[in-house]
Regions:
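A short acidic, helix-capping loop that chelates divalent metal ions and anchors anionic groups
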Residues: 11-16, 104-112, 173-177, 260-261
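Auxiliary Fe-S-binding modules of radical SAM enzymes
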Residues: 155-159, 169-310
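Canonical Radical SAM [4Fe-4S] cluster-binding loop centered on the CxxxCxxC motif
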Residues: 1-23
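Short "lid" loop at the C-terminus of a central beta-strand within the Rossmann-like core
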Residues: 7, 141-143, 170-172
Length: 310
């Protein structure tokens, strides 16, 4: 998408990672195993676009074999979902979140910088529901871009009987031309929804550290989430660690640099070594960028969203 991997920066001349620099499935599994004793309960596979990774279902199966109680999720643009959803389900995937910012084909193509039509994503969503996966829609809202899609996205979530989560446009990385003026706050989005669909009632989080603030639309018994890292940050309750495709551990979405686990693994570190290291890193983290945004000096080179997922 234009706010994640804009073509002017990630074009045919961009130097992507060489194969040897990419973390292998076996190395991912070692990291997951090392985090289980630390309280890991959920693994989300993101991107980039995870369904472009060769044999991604094998990774899901390997993670599932570690612990049958792990919650395994995936975030995808949905374009390839329809043809892979049955194998994903059989491999052990529990839930899928589909990114969808517009139901208007022209605007969808503009925001995703693609030639695909919305219908293909909707087919993927329906296929995932039919396969028995738990499904959510994620929608990033930008001012003067897709505010007019908010109520259409709510209507779609009603039609499919699945939650939709609205995300404030975030200042992740340096390539997405972020400006505070482009942010439509969660409150503004709720006001738009309530004018069309009636009152929303705030509900309790489903678990500690849930990033989306949950609201209930009584008229349709529908859950709507709002991820408000700009207007209402949640650093103090964040429980998410991120592993990049080159094996770095990031303790914050807005980090300038990560901790290189891959090099340590390739120096023969074992599961225990990693567990001790990750525990130490996590317990010493001081990331509060979203809460301190106004006071923080400019980060010289924050990590791009496409490196570590959402």
């Amino acid at each position: 998408c234009t706010y994640c991997m804009p073509k002017e920066h990630f074009d045919s001349n961009y130097k992507f990672l060489a194969k040897g620099q990419i973390i292998s499935y076996e190395e991912i599994i070692l990291i997951v195993k090392s985090m289980l004793p630390l309280g890991l309960s959920k693994v989300r596979i993101t991107g980039g676009e995870p369904l472009l990774r060769k044999d991604i279902c094998s990774l899901i199966s390997m993670i599932r074999d570690l612990d049958e109680n792990l919650d395994i999720a995936m975030t995808t643009n949905g374009v390839l979902l329809k043809n892979k959803v049955q194998t994903l389900k059989e491999s052990g995937l529990d839930r899928v979140t589909v990114s969808l910012d517009s139901l208007d084909d022209d605007l969808f193509k503009e925001m995703t910088d693609s030639k695909f039509e919305v219908s293909r994503v909707l087919e993927g969503i329906k296929s995932a529901i039919d396969a028995g996966l738990k499904v959510k829609i994620n929608s990033v809202i930008k001012r003067n871009k897709n505010e007019n899609q908010i109520n259409n996205l709510v209507k779609t979530s009603i039609e499919y009987n699945i939650p939709v989560r609205f995300i404030e446009f975030m200042d992740v990385g340096t390539t997405n031309s972020w400006k505070l003026d482009s942010v439509v706050t969660g409150k503004e989005i709720r006001d738009i929804i309530q004018r069309e669909f009636g009152p929303l009632t705030k509900t309790k989080p489903n678990y500690y550290g849930e990033v989306a603030k949950q609201w209930k639309m009584a008229r349709h018994d529908l859950d709507i989430g709002f991820i408000e890292s700009i207007s209402s940050p949640f650093c103090g309750s964040c429980t998410r660690a991120r592993i990049s495709s080159n094996g770095k551990l990031f303790t914050c979405l807005f980090s300038e640099q990560g901790y290189d686990l891959l090099s340590i693994i390739r120096m023969q570190a074992d599961e225990h070594d990693l567990s001790v290291l990750i525990s130490d890193i996590w317990n010493k983290r001081i990331d509060r960028y979203s809460e301190d945004r106004k006071e923080v000096k400019v980060i010289s080179k924050p990590v791009e969203m496409s490196y570590i997922g959402g």
